[in-house]
Swiss-Prot record:
Name under which the protein is recorded: Putative amine oxidase [copper-containing]
Active-site residues, record numbering mapped to chain: D387, Y475
Cofactor note: Binds 1 copper ion per subunit. Binds 2 calcium ions per subunit.
Keyword Transferase recorded: no
GO CC terms, sorted: extracellular region; plasma membrane
Binding positions for Ca(2+) 1 per the UniProt entry: D534, D536, D682, L683
Binding annotation for substrate: 385-395, 472-477
Tissue specificity statement from the Swiss-Prot or TrEMBL entry: Prismatic layer of shell (at protein level). Expressed primarily in the mantle with highest level in the mantle edge and lower level in the mantle pallium.
Family: Belongs to the copper/topaquinone oxidase family.
Residue numbers of 2',4',5'-topaquinone PTMs: Y475
InterPro entries (alphabetical): Cu_Am_Ox_Cu-bd, Cu_Am_ox_TPQ-bd, Cu_amine_oxidase, Cu_amine_oxidase_C, Cu_amine_oxidase_C_sf, Cu_amine_oxidase_N-reg, Cu_amine_oxidase_N2
Length: 781
């Protein structure tokens, strides 16, 4: 959310106060006789306004979005309709985002030591051309910004591969509701206790859809989905009714091809109605649930309350103000500096990540989130979700201080364009930034006696976190980018939210999941996450090498047994020369380190000044290659893949992935199939993490987070002469005044004194704020 520009002479402390008020972070009032902590006006430097002249990595501003709209609506050949008039068979703008210049131009601009013109800004705009014959999705590059005068076609995509959108959802929902209610109203009411139309407080609804693309149906150009029926109570995903319809969409023509009910398939709604009139037809009765606080699917406080009294939980405080700054989507923290932005389709991305002003990563970006379910009935059997097609970035909004992020975090809005609004939409609290004491230590050691001691030295593990949370239907995903003081960059993902269970039957008992209550099976599913890591270690000419740890068979000189041998481990340097050699599938019998470096730069000791990539979230996909939808997500085959960077291979996935084909819009296999040289080239590491989730009763109502976090790390490896965090003012050293005579006492070396703080932590006013503005957290139409 934007703030007014600072007037000349305005006290910076007041600006900090205004920032915190707008963010719902704190209230500078007296509480129980003690004042809340003062904010250091020197440290609090965040500016969350939109720039008039955006930096190169900054998202499109609202001014730029509006100017692109105005320009395109004047292009008569596009025949664009405004939101509200658009239908799936018309031409309308689906969305737009920043289109980055060529990397070489960006690097030249960033590294130039003389004034250099900034590469012109541009937008990539997605237009649904339902008005064409055949219908098509067209992407255009519109430039230069902020006042565009030109556009060029970027690519065309078959219309049946278009991502899900509000215009289509509304049309499909209306069609399904009327068709099914018109033929099966009595059947639905007697079987599931509710209706689709005029339902009062006993409503049924088609809430979820399992895409069935050409690679599944083996029908070229087909766009189909299984739509599941649920009882519409909180939360509807936990109230399936074992009824689904397979719908085929060709242009604006909708056809119901199959109906599934009670382990039976039918060719039409009329066939179901005909069989239902037969007294011998197998009945299924699922009573409509009574909505109450005790309902198992409801996220309301219940059970044995704890703690015994309502005592507030602990929280962190910044006693002397924030130690980071945010301005124009650039964050500065200790020795770190980076830019961040949001892709409406693919989610959060970081750029120009520097440590001690040395470029480490040019781009770190989420590529896709995939969930593959298993089940006995078609909605789960074919539930292969590519979340990019549901627009990962558009679903960032409404993080709650004190729960989703610390109360004192800096909350940042994003502006995007959707097909349902002429004005740019504000995603309130799309990001948060905060510094956090993890409760661990970065390093520590105590030596209690001589000759080394006595001494103690330790540094708390303090990190900066940039967080985004996306909610795709039933699941919530926390995406953290974590910056450690010693030059380590961590990327973490944590899934939570509601599972998608199926109705319990004898056919699916124990095969696809455990029985959770008297009517549900918690279906097995596989979460997978792919990230792009464009690594630039001392420039763009890098090498990828694995340090293979192998067995060393050597002599055993102290053994009395003749010819005895001794086994230990040794390092084998393995330079990966081609892309096919750089495809990594974890093998427990072959431990290794993955390092990236510039061969032209060595440390004083002669070592390669490298960064190590550590994947601690690995998960193996068991699906045969190119089976079903597997080929659309070929990146899931490898836990790490390293390729030569190309401007034509910018993402491993796309928003066109849901309806899988044998030839997807982005085919990741093509990235390495040409097997190019990767020695001394600009390299990209594609990192895949994942976890198999077998739901259990404790996943009701919502999956908890402990044990589900997945992380990968970029860590300096002979890059610095010593620990770069040795200069941390957060360190504490305790030693004897005279190590030979402890009775003379000890001395303590520390430079921060939070124990002197006598004020209380700021009290957030967020909940008062949203009482008046519920759209901050919810979509209010």
């Amino acid at each position: 959310m934007s703030l007014p520009k600072t007037a000349n002479g305005m006290d910076k402390l007041k600006l900090c106060y205004l920032l915190l008020f707008y963010l719902g972070s704190s209230s500078l009032t007296e509480v129980s006789g003690a004042q809340t902590c003062e904010i250091d006006s020197v440290l609090c430097t965040s500016d969350l306004s939109e720039p008039d002249d955006p930096p190169i990595f900054h998202d499109l501003t609202t001014k730029e979005i509006k100017s692109v709209q105005t320009y395109l609506y004047h292009q008569r050949d596009l025949r664009l309709l405004r939101p509200g008039l658009a239908k799936i068979n018309t031409s309308f703008i689906q969305g737009m985002e920043l289109y980055l210049p060529n990397k070489k131009d960006v690097i030249h601009y960033l590294q130039s030591k003389v004034p250099t013109p900034k590469p012109p800004r541009a937008a990539v705009v997605t237009i649904f051309r339902g008005d064409c014959d055949p219908a098509v999705v067209e992407e255009y590059i519109v430039f230069p910004l902020p006042w565009p005068t030109q556009h060029r076609l970027h690519r065309k995509v078959p219309y049946y591969l278009r991502p899900f959108n509000d215009v289509e959802f509304a049309t499909i929902s209306d069609f399904l509701t009327k068709q099914v209610d018109g033929v099966l109203r009595q059947f639905l009411e007697e079987s599931f206790g509710g209706r689709l139309i005029n339902c009062g407080n006993r409503c049924l609804n088609f809430q979820f859809a399992s895409p069935v693309g050409p690679s599944v149906s083996n029908e070229p150009g087909a766009r189909k989905s299984w739509y599941w029926l649920h009882q519409l109570v909180e939360y509807s995903a936990l109230h399936p009714v074992d009824f689904a319809v397979l719908m085929k969409i060709v242009g604006c023509v909708y056809t119901i091809e199959k109906v599934y009910f009670n382990n039976m398939y039918f060719n039409s709604l009329q066939e179901v109605a005909l069989h239902y009139r037969n007294p011998s037809f197998p009945r299924l009765r699922i009573p409509y649930p009574v909505d109450s606080k005790q309902l198992f699917s409801k996220m309301e406080r219940r059970g044995i309350l704890f703690p015994e009294k309502p005592v507030s939980p602990p929280r962190q405080v910044e006693p002397e103000g924030k130690r980071y700054s945010v301005k124009y989507q650039e964050v500065k923290y200790m020795n770190w500096k980076f830019n961040f932005r949001l892709s409406p389709g693919l989610g959060p991305r970081l750029h120009n990540i520097r440590y001690h002003d040395r470029l480490i990563v040019y781009e770190l970006a989420l590529q896709d989130i995939v969930v593959f379910y298993s089940g006995a009935e078609p909605p789960h059997q074919y539930a292969n979700f590519f979340d990019s097609s549901y627009m990962i970035g558009m679903n960032l909004q409404g993080m709650v201080p004190g729960v989703d992020c610390p109360t004192g975090a800096t909350f940042i809005d994003s502006h995007i364009l959707t097909e349902s609004s002429l004005k740019p939409a504000k995603l309130i609290n799309a990001f948060c930034v905060f510094e956090q004491n993890t409760g661990d230590f970065l390093r520590r050691h105590i030596s209690k006696t001589s000759p080394d001691g006595p001494f103690y030295e330790g540094v708390p593990s303090i990190v900066l976190v940039l967080r985004a949370i996306t909610t795709i239907a039933n699941y919530d995903y926390t995406i953290d980018f974590i910056f450690h003081h010693n030059g380590v960059l961590q990327t973490k993902v944590v899934p939570t939210g509601y599972i998608l269970p199926s109705l319990y039957t004898k056919q699916n008992e124990n095969k696809y999941g455990f029985r959770l209550n008297n009517k549900l099976i918690g279906n097995l599913h596989h979460h997978l996450f792919n990230f792009k890591v464009d690594i630039d270690i001392n420039g763009q000419h890098n090498r990828y090498e694995t340090l293979d740890i192998v067995l060393d068979k050597t002599s055993h000189p102290v053994s009395k047994k003749p010819y005895d041998v001794w086994y230990q481990n040794k390092i084998k340097h393995n330079l990966r020369k081609t892309e096919m050699e750089a495809l990594f599938k974890y093998d427990f019998d072959k431990p290794m380190h993955h390092i990236f470096y510039n061969n032209n730069l060595k440390s004083p000791e002669g070592n390669n000044m490298a960064y190590r990539l550590v994947n601690r979230g690995m998960s193996k996909s068991l699906l045969p290659e190119c089976s079903g939808n597997e080929g659309t997500g070929a990146w899931m085959r490898h836990q790490i893949a390293v390729t030569k960077r190309k401007e034509t291979e910018l993402t491993s996935s796309s928003v066109y992935s849901a309806f899988g084909t044998k030839n997807p819009v982005v085919n990741f296999r093509n990235f390495y199939a040409d097997n190019e040289n990767i020695v001394d080239e600009d390299l990209v590491a594609w990192v895949t993490m994942g976890t198999y989730h077998i739901p259990h009763t404790e996943d009701l109502p919502v999956t908890h987070t402990p044990g589900l976090d997945l992380s990968f790390f970029l860590s300096p490896f002979n890059y610095f002469p010593e620990d770069p965090a040795m200069g941390s003012r957060d360190s504490v050293r305790i030693e004897a005044v005279d190590k030979n005579n402890l009775k003379r006492g000890i001395k303590i070396d520390k430079q921060t004194f939070p124990e002197k703080m006598t004020c209380k932590a700021p009290i957030g006013n967020y909940f008062e704020y949203i009482l008046k503005r519920p759209n901050v957290i919810f979509d209010i139409q």
